[in-house]
């Protein structure tokens, strides 16, 4: 069993037959070595108990803790109890949880290629051997034979490479000159077929020589350059890509200490029984996992092949080859049903679920049980936009918040002597008393939460936020953090988690808060940038007059867009005078009172220390007043001067939308300046 405290990662790869045997072999207290599964029986149809020496009991431990297959009971861990196993059925008196991790193995009568390495694209076996996949498939499934180049020995057949077994005349004429046993010896020495031929070729490979030869060939192809023939250039490009993949694959085998011949199986691991259970349903019927039926099929065919090879010496070679092909197909179906075409079905025309079907996909063992399993102190809901939230805050619905922080609220009620025990505190929470929400607010103030949106493809897929209570049942999120999550507000769901330990809370505050992750970890570009709805909002907010006062004064066609209203009695336009405001608060107040629109042009008094005057710009108009003051009107601003031509006031021509955007930017800059000054 994997110790979760000692092992922090899981790696899947090829292993040697010796390692498979070490995992599955177990020595009983009487010295008997068990682990190999030889019989295909499961449960007896009368007693509903496992058959002895099958792949359900003796090799894997008792079904119930301390109870053997005979029904005898022993106390687990008691030193006085003797013996430690049942002498009749051979079952050891141990905890039944051993059946979740105790493996077995099937000793195959012939080598069998692992279908993942042969049929999956790209084919690792084809890449290493540098041979077409179709030829290798014909060799594995006994459609072709391989003539062995035996060195330092005379060869009777002058054959090299692959040839079709069925069309050779030698198999009819040569046996006339040999005895049956002599012909079998000759054939086994010079002719090879099936997965054994693949295993021999893989075992003869030198990975370092493969890397050197592939690099040399790649350089030679690169020196040739373009031939001018598009077809030849594509062929060379595909060959170069293949050589790169072959080098990377060989380096991976060297780096992970994996031998290529391990892709051909000699021992087939048998899963622990609890991972392929047989359960009893109503009516006394048994329901079995599909993998049990597929294992049973492998054992039947393997035992038949063993009998043909050991007990019947006069068995024709064609029959042995046919049975080897059946064993190969049975193992293929067990590992990946349907990968070679038509999948295997049961009597009800239902496709059997193979090992690949059990582990792959959204409902597979990894994504559903190990990675996507539900955990405590977590929730899930739809996300909606929260434009009024700060960047580091998220809106948490009351219904979710009270469930996530319930234990903290109970502790707060008891500490403040508002509840005498846990039961009373839970009663107050169920009744939703006002004091509960007050304590919940206090608890949430100092406790961050983690928001995660699947799939988590990079570290910004999970970030920390300071939660605030909101009405409704949806999680509110600031729109600027959506790009890191790759989220939008069209029905996306996000999970919320509560970090419990002090270390997790510190990590969330120092590393995972959203305002601490403003740059992309991959390329360093800003990731908290306006997108989608925010860009449209900014456009609407600043979509006032960009062409100055001349558009409104001298272009009658555009007057309707700038508060020029059409009279109902004639076809003339009435020009509404653009209002003047002394500060931005008055302008926003007028907008809230609906005296002006969001994009209505207005004149806003500007500070004298922030000049907007262009040195070479000349005024469009100059208005003089009776007291000697005069107005210089430019395209986007207006200057009020005294009699001595001193600047009294400066007005800029803007809109309420521009004012609101400027105030937000100004407040953000001031907040950053205060934070920087306090930090230094």
Curated annotation (Swiss-Prot):
- Any idea which positions bind Mg(2+)? 488, 490, 492
GO MF, one term, reads: magnesium ion binding
How the cofactor is bound: the record states: Binds 1 Mg(2+) ion per subunit. Binds 1 Zn(2+) ion per subunit.
Q: Among the entry's GO cellular component annotations, what is one?
A: DNA-directed RNA polymerase complex
Record's HAMAP family?
RNApol_bact_RpoC1
Residues that hold Zn(2+) according to the record: 68, 70, 86, 89
State how it assembles.
Answer: In plastids the minimal PEP RNA polymerase catalytic core is composed of four subunits: alpha, beta, beta', and beta''. When a (nuclear-encoded) sigma factor is associated with the core the holoenzyme is formed, which can initiate transcription.
Organism annotation: Nicotiana tabacum (Common tobacco)
| Domain of life, source organism | Eukaryota
Chief location of this protein?
plastid
Q: List the disulfide bonds.
A: none
**Localized where?**
Plastid, Chloroplast
Q: Which family does the record claim for this protein? A: Belongs to the RNA polymerase beta' chain family. RpoC1 subfamily.
Outline what the protein does.
DNA-dependent RNA polymerase catalyzes the transcription of DNA into RNA using the four ribonucleoside triphosphates as substrates.
Full protein name = DNA-directed RNA polymerase subunit beta'
Reactions catalysed: RNA(n) + a ribonucleoside 5'-triphosphate = RNA(n+1) + diphosphate
């Amino acid at each position: 069993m994997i110790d979760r405290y000692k092992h922090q990662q899981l790696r899947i790869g090829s292993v040697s037959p010796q390692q498979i045997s070490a995992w599955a072999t177990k020595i009983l207290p009487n010295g008997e070595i068990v682990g190999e599964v030889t019989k295909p029986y499961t449960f007896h149809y009368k007693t509903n108990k496992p058959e002895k020496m099958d792949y359900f009991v003796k090799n894997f431990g008792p079904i119930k803790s301390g109870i053997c297959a005979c029904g005898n009971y022993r106390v687990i861990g008691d030193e006085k109890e003797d013996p430690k196993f049942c002498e009749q059925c051979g079952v050891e008196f141990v905890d039944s949880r051993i059946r979740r991790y105790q493996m077995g193995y099937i000793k195959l009568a012939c080598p069998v290629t692992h279908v993942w390495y042969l049929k999956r694209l790209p084919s690792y076996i084809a890449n290493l051997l540098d041979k077409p996949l179709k030829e290798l498939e014909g060799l594995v499934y006994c459609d072709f034979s391989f003539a062995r180049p035996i060195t330092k020995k005379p060869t009777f057949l002058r054959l090299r490479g692959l040839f079709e077994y069925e069309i050779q005349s030698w198999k009819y004429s040569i046996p006339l000159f040999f005895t049956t046993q002599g012909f079998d010896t000759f054939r086994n020495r010079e002719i090879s077929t099936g997965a054994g031929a693949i295993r021999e070729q893989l075992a003869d490979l030198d990975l370092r020589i493969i890397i050197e030869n592939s690099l040399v060939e790649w350089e030679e192809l690169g020196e040739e350059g373009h031939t001018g023939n598009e077809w030849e250039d594509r062929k060379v490009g595909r060959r170069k890509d293949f050589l790169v993949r072959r080098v990377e694959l060989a380096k991976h085998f060297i780096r992970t200490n994996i031998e290529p011949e391990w892709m051909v199986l000699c021992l087939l691991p048998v899963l622990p029984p609890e991972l392929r259970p047989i359960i009893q349903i109503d009516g006394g019927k048994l329901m079995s996992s599909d993998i049990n039926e597929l294992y049973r099929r492998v054992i039947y065919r393997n035992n038949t092949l063993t009998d043909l090879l050991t007990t019947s010496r006069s068995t024709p070679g064609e029959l042995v080859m046919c049975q080897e092909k059946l064993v190969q197909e049975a193992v293929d179906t067990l590992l990946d049903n349907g990968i070679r075409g038509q999948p295997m079905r049961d009597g009800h025309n239902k496709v059997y679920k193979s090992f690949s079907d059990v582990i792959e996909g959204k409902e597979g063992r990894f994504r559903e049980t190990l990675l996507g399993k539900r955990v405590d102190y977590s929730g899930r809901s739809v996300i909606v936009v929260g434009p009024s939230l700060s960047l580091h805050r998220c809106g948490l619905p009351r219904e979710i918040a009270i469930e996530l922080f319930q234990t903290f609220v109970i502790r707060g009620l008891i500490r403040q002597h508002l509840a005498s025990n846990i039961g009373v505190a839970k009663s107050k929470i169920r009744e939703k008393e006002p004091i509960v929400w007050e304590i919940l607010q206090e608890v949430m103030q100092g406790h961050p939460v983690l928001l995660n949106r699947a799939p988590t493809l990079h570290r910004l897929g999970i970030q920390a936020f300071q939660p605030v209570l909101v009405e409704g049942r949806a999680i509110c999120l600031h729109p600027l953090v959506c790009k890191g999550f790759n989220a939008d507000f069209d029905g996306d769901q996000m999970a919320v988690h509560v970090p419990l330990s002090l270390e997790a809370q510190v990590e969330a505050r120092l590393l995972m808060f959203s305002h601490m992750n403003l740059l992309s970890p991959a390329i360093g570009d800003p990731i908290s940038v306006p997108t989608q709805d925010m860009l449209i909002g900014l456009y609407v907010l600043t979509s006032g007059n960009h062409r100055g006062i001349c558009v409104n004064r001298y272009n009658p066609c555009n007057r309707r867009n700038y508060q020029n209203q059409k009279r109902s009695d004639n076809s003339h336009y009435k020009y509404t005078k653009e209002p003047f405001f002394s500060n931005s608060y008055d302008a926003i107040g007028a907008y809230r009172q609906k005296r002006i629109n969001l994009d209505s042009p207005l004149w806003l008094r500007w500070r004298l220390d922030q000049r907007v005057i262009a040195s070479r710009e000349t005024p469009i108009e100059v208005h003089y007043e009776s007291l000697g003051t005069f107005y210089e009107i430019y395209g986007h601003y207006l200057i009020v001067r005294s009699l001595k031509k001193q600047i009294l006031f400066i007005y800029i021509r803007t809109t309420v939308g521009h004012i609101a955007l400027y105030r937000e930017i100004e407040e953000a800059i001031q907040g950053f300046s205060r934070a920087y000054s306090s930090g230094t």
